[in-house]
Amino acid sequence: MTDIDVRLREDVHVLGELLGETIRQQHGDAFLQKIEDIRHSAKADRRGPGEQLSSTLADLAEDDLLPVARAFNQFLNLANMAEQYQLIRRRDADQPEPFEARVLPELLARLKQAGHSNDALARQLAKLDIQLVLTAHPTEVARRTLIQKYDAIAGQLAAQDHRDLSPAERQQVRERLRRLIAEAWHTEEIRRTRPTPVDEAKWGFAVIEHSLWHAIPSHLRKVDKALLEATGLRLPLEAAPIRFASWMGGDRDGNPNVTAAVTREVLLLARWMAADLFLRDIDALAAELSMQQANDALRERVGDSAEPYRAVLKQLRDRLRATRAWAHSALASNQPAGAEVLVDNRDLIAPLELCYQSLHDCGMGVIAEGPLLDCLRRAVTFGLFLGRLDVRQDAARHRDALTEITDYLGLGRYADWDEEQRIGFLQAELKNRRPLLPAHFKPQADTAEVLATCREVAAAPAASLGSYVISMAGAASDVLAVQLLLKEAGLTRPMRVVPLFETLADLDNAGPVMQRLLGLPGYRAGLRGPQEVMIGYSDSAKDAGTTAAAWAQYRAQENLVRICAEHQVELLLFHGRGGTVGRGGGPAHAAILSQPPGSVAGRFRTTEQGEMIRFKFGLPGIAEQNLNLYLAAVLEATLLPPPPPQPAWRELMDQLAADGVKAYRSVVRENPDFVEYFRQSTPEQELGRLPLGSRPAKRRAGGIESLRAIPWIFGWTQTRLMLPAWLGWETALSNALARGQGELLAQMREQWPFFRTRIDMLEMVLAKADAQIAEAYDERLVQPHLLPLGAHLRDLLSQSCQVVLGLTGQPVLLAHSPETLEFISLRNTYLDPLHRLQAELLARSRSREAALDSPLEQALLVTVAGIAAGLRNTG
């Protein structure tokens, strides 16, 4: 065990000890002993038959349910924070830098060895276009209040690490930790009400303010340093290889709470926040830049001022204050922006560049390269809007709106027309100079909302908006329909309208749809920049299982690369990944390097979801590491793409996908008991009551198809069966081995990044799965006639584990990563009581109608949050 591991264990021990002291102070020694007994029972059950813990928990008095659940939940959150801090802990001089810090310098060295010139490397790095899209899917269980306390705890762990602390200072740190842990313990874990879409957007702004605002300039300093050392060239000031966008306040797909008014409010809040953040920077810079000497360009701007830099910054500060004041007042009224309000990012960047260049010209480069450069990097990356807001809506809503319009105009029903009729109508109207809608048209509420959203898009500054994403897109007309509605709303500038292909059938049809669209007269001429296409991971996996979905996603991307090349159109692929393997999640670095050759051509757009935003970007140091990984992976996939898969690999993957989807659907769609079993064995129905996000957990009607991908995954994750992430693989891989294709599978795993990444992610999720825990839920919750189905699914889980072990040649899952295995083992001691307690609470809750704010229901919600924290993902 390394010294680093020892320090992590020490941190976890200290945090656990302080939590125990806090619990003792509120509940007494006897209760704390009860917690210890439960923990020891959990350990004993892992070694024995596994009945001690369940009987201990079944005997708990009603009043003990909530504090017991809270104790284990709090410990897992504290362990998470210790692990997160461990990732960014200062290394001693004799310890190697972490992979995340080395990845870019080592990649640049490899690229030079591969024959890339210094100029080519610098040029490609400067023009990288990586967009991380923050989304508010309801997977962030922890409250923002608690997250801030956990972040403060990380700060005290860092303070504790300083070697030169006096005993008194060390004691002060310990007292601060004790106080923060007490504050967390005495704070409710669960929101009493659902957040609004505006609350979610504010949470996104908080991630930028507290973490990304600091991480970006630090990350770009290191990129600049690595590039300079490798090539002798600098990263240009105008380069922003990574930018941010958001769906919070723009994603109205299935969420009636996201209205046109909400989108307008979120856009204004973003402008207010951006102005406020830049004002803080400018105030600090004005205090520093007191120098008198300036170049001619700056003097021309401010005359003979004794403090020319402060004079320039004062002008910018006045405009930022005017912008902030206007955004604040515009939230309450439709007040138009005055001339002083900043709208163009160049008006923010130019004064900063002027100061930077003047300082260099006057021999004060060391000052220019300080906080001024950091502010400039922020201005280029975040701009006046922090990031671009995407709009997303279901294709059916646009079809319904156009149907009402054509019906009103006496043209027939748009919904009843075939694809050629729709395209003919849409193209003719797009060319037509007259409005489509008469002024006196009074649409139904749903159509009125679609049109109002389009008007907000048309009215907003171009730089504040990203893409208009069409979910469940299935035809070229779906794209033209949005273009027509935007034209009707008064949009005169180009905007990316992005089809999202989600189901297995839609992914298979993505190529033909885009072939038709790009072949339409005038369509390509209207493109400004690349054609963006979104690939959906969540719904395709729920529809067909991850075996078939992963291959369909890969093939769809290959087809899109080929078709766009044929039409001489640049392609930007937008990856709609979730946080879990069942929704396309997994380590970003490996995922990017496993994309089809040519699909990452210097551009990459992906969603970052829910609790994964906190784990990957919640602390500046960790955010910086993840930004490094994204940048290095996109650069490598662009300049050193993997070779295309061999025909034999493709053929076997076709067969694996066919066997996988058949096995998956035979359980999920064809077994008449499956839906009932799912609802009884998991907390799926109770999750609908959890005030997680602003979006409803179900679509309007139906069975499994109506469930959104997130509660579908969330339910199985809570019981540790993890079914959506592996079901289908056990049959597909077993069949391949039975056909004597073991050597070919081994070759694919060794030589094909796509297949290796799939198997690695499968192994990770199987290591987190736990048949014993899943069985405990069945024993407590499932009616006798459904128990055989649960046993069958656990047999399939065991089969999955065995076939993966056979493929990897390891004695146990994750044998190659003992540290990860140790983390899982450590967490199980605290997760097991939460799982068993959750099953007990579900049984009690279902046997009687409990009020949402009763101790029983509150305890149930705390177990949900604790398990999500312990597994580091939810949906």
Curated annotation (Swiss-Prot):
<dbReference type="GO" id="GO:0005829">
    <property type="term" value="C:cytosol"/>
</dbReference>
<dbReference type="InterPro" id="IPR033129">
    <property type="entry name" value="PEPCASE_His_AS"/>
</dbReference>
<dbReference type="InterPro" id="IPR018129">
    <property type="entry name" value="PEP_COase_Lys_AS"/>
</dbReference>
<dbReference type="GO" id="GO:0015977">
    <property type="term" value="P:carbon fixation"/>
</dbReference>
<keyword id="KW-0460">Magnesium</keyword>
<dbReference type="GO" id="GO:0008964">
    <property type="term" value="F:phosphoenolpyruvate carboxylase activity"/>
</dbReference>
<dbReference type="GO" id="GO:0000287">
    <property type="term" value="F:magnesium ion binding"/>
</dbReference>
<dbReference type="Pfam" id="PF00311">
    <property type="entry name" value="PEPcase"/>
</dbReference>
<dbReference type="InterPro" id="IPR021135">
    <property type="entry name" value="PEP_COase"/>
</dbReference>
<feature type="active site">
    <location>
        <position position="137"/>
    </location>
</feature>
<comment type="similarity">
    <text>Belongs to the PEPCase type 1 family.</text>
</comment>
<dbReference type="InterPro" id="IPR022805">
    <property type="entry name" value="PEP_COase_bac/pln-type"/>
</dbReference>
<keyword id="KW-0456">Lyase</keyword>
<protein>
    <recommendedName>
        <fullName>Phosphoenolpyruvate carboxylase</fullName>
        <ecNumber>4.1.1.31</ecNumber>
    </recommendedName>
</protein>
<feature type="active site">
    <location>
        <position position="542"/>
    </location>
</feature>
<keyword id="KW-0120">Carbon dioxide fixation</keyword>
<dbReference type="GO" id="GO:0006099">
    <property type="term" value="P:tricarboxylic acid cycle"/>
</dbReference>
<dbReference type="GO" id="GO:0006107">
    <property type="term" value="P:oxaloacetate metabolic process"/>
</dbReference>
<dbReference type="InterPro" id="IPR015813">
    <property type="entry name" value="Pyrv/PenolPyrv_kinase-like_dom"/>
</dbReference>
<comment type="function">
    <text>Forms oxaloacetate, a four-carbon dicarboxylic acid source for the tricarboxylic acid cycle.</text>
</comment>
